[in-house]
Amino acid sequence: MKRVTERQKGMLRLNAVVNHEVYQTYYKRICECETDRVFCCHQMNHLLDVARIAYIKNLEEGLGFDKELIYVAAVLHDIGKSFQYRQQIPHEIAGERIARRILDSLPTGFTFTDEEKALICLAVRGHRRRHEHMKPIEELFYESDKRSRMCLSCMAEKKCNWNEEEKIWR
């Protein structure tokens, strides 16, 4: 029998989320919607960039969030994007619902506590716009999401509808 190390166990819940049938369904819809998109996309490269930036900021600022929680929130933060493209439903609202559905149906042994689920859903819901009284997890994901974008070298930057505050790299 192969022994699972502590390091390998560290991301098993992340794998359970990414391999979840509901996640795969909505992730594929995003990919379909963005096939010919010239602006920033919301696929795995972006999701993992957000995760890495958030984790670095978490360490630098001593926020104390768990690494796996950050990565799970990152892969879920744009999961509602196809609803924004197809039905004009803000992706953070649709995404929070989808995230909750996934988190509530993970197999035994891969579940999150209620507190962890609440933090992940707050990151998904609060990452899009800066607002007064942001919680640390919302601020972390707002900043990480914006910093993940390469506006400085983007060929479509002039046509982009992001305001100057959002174009942090500019």
Short names for language-model regions:
Residues 1-170:
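Metal-dependent phosphohydrolase cores
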